[in-house]
Amino acid sequence: RKNISAHYDLGNDFYEAWLDPTMSYSSALEPGEDGLEAAQRRKWDALAARIGAAPKVLEIGCGWGGLAGFLAARGADVTAISLSDEQLAWAAAHHGAGVDFRKQDYRDCEGQFDAIVSVEMVEALGREYWPTFMDCIARNLKPGGRAAIQYIAMRDDLFDAYAKSADFIQAYIFPGGLLIRTSEFRRLAEERGLAWQDQRDFGGDYAATLE
């Protein structure tokens, strides 16, 4: 919780100065001539397509609430959680209609949802908490439900060396965080009876987002 607060509670003015108008702090989808905001909304469309017309949705790590607000506008009953006071205040002010924004740890989530979404949150947890994160998905997802998880992956052949050292991002941007490798994430899902389907890799879009 201290790591989350140290990073995300720097003040919303700081993030508004350099994020796009949707306040999306994650990779967009297919950034191009129509601009970053359009690419972020394209990502939301893609995530919404993956979960279908789910009536009850949980978002783990909701950031400034853009995706939650988007899903609510499409008719979903959305519960969105974060540990950042600054993010939650901004989210409630801009996307409060139809969304239940909560300051809550994902480990404390108890409910049954038709769909779960999480965008670039698992990287902040640290390796020891990856199983707990997947426990949360399995516990709170209704039978037949869908989860759409966007995450930044580390290649298997680079992971061991990466995990043994602290790079610039771990030291100065996301203390306590670690990028997950897809093989490990998939194993954790399948061990809990979750089917791993429809994987889409778009790492190149992250580079374009940062540009």
Segments and roles (model prediction):
Residues 1-17:
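N-terminal auxiliary segments of SAM/dcSAM-dependent transferases
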Residues 54-61:
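Conserved class I S-adenosyl-L-methionine
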Residues 96-107:
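Conserved SAM-binding strand-loop segment of SAM-dependent methyltransferases
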Residues 153-211:
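Substrate-binding/catalytic lobe of Class I Rossmann-like enzymes that use SAM or dcSAM, i.e.
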Residues 107-116:
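A short acidic, Gly/Pro-enriched loop at the edge of an enzyme's catalytic core
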Residues 144-152:
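Conserved beta-strand signature within the Rossmann-like core of class I S-adenosyl-L-methionine
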